[in-house]
Amino acid sequence: MATVSMRDMLQAGVHFGHQTRYWNPKMKPFIFGARNKVHIINLEKTVPLFNEALAELKKISSRKGKILFVGTKRAASEAVKEAANNCDQFFVNHRWLGGMLTNWKTVRQSIKRLKDLEIQSQDGTFDKLTKKEALMRTRELNKLENSLGGIKDMGGLPDALFVVDADHEHIAIKEANNLGIPVFSIVDTNSDPDGVDFIIPGNDDAIRAVKLYLNAVADAVKEGRSQDLAVQAEESFVEAE
């Protein structure tokens, strides 16, 4: 089963929080101390919490649950996309558009427009337009792909959110809370853990740490999915008998 050890976390710098003056007092239970005015996160808390989160994500995935990866900070953007694609899940890695979850009906219309434009760009429709019209549609296509490309095949609301930075993605977390969608999130020492169902105290800036979380989550999701496929195969085998 996908798990992460304390050694893995130490090597990735998961224990380095933010400067002490930027701390959120609600994170006090997860802080070990401070060194050179930087908070040190207590990995004895983080390791079991992260592994519990991985086990739960695996369970959701084994029930065909959809996981939405959210990380719109520039540094994490590419890693978020890679991890989601790696486990055939969904992602938002540029700007979070307000209402992305709570106003799904409107988002669905924008996704339809995106898919229509994709077809037009491939079937020669763009070639029949004036240069200006073709350019405008290409720009619209790129803009929609940027914001909705990672969720265009989600087909409905996700069953869980995995968030890289609770502070930066507070709007996404609030929307998930309003809809009762469980939130799994990395929470650094400057962040508010309220609204996060599965708190993972850790560094949300170092790219090595971010990749460690994302790869472990992708592995857990893949394990859950293969468990689901194994059950399906077993059931069809029993029916065939």
From Swiss-Prot:
One of its GO terms (biological process) is translation. Keywords: Ribonucleoprotein, Ribosomal protein. The keyword Ribosomal protein applies. GO terms for molecular function: structural constituent of ribosome. InterPro entries: Ribosomal_uS2, Ribosomal_uS2_bac/mit/plastid, Ribosomal_uS2_CS, Ribosomal_uS2_flav_dom_sf. One of its GO terms (cellular component) is cytosolic small ribosomal subunit. The keyword Ribosomal protein applies. Pfam families: Ribosomal_S2 (PF00318). HAMAP family: Ribosomal_uS2_B. Belongs to the universal ribosomal protein uS2 family. This is Small ribosomal subunit protein uS2. It comes from Yersinia enterocolitica serotype O:8 / biotype 1B (strain NCTC 13174 / 8081). The gene is rpsB.
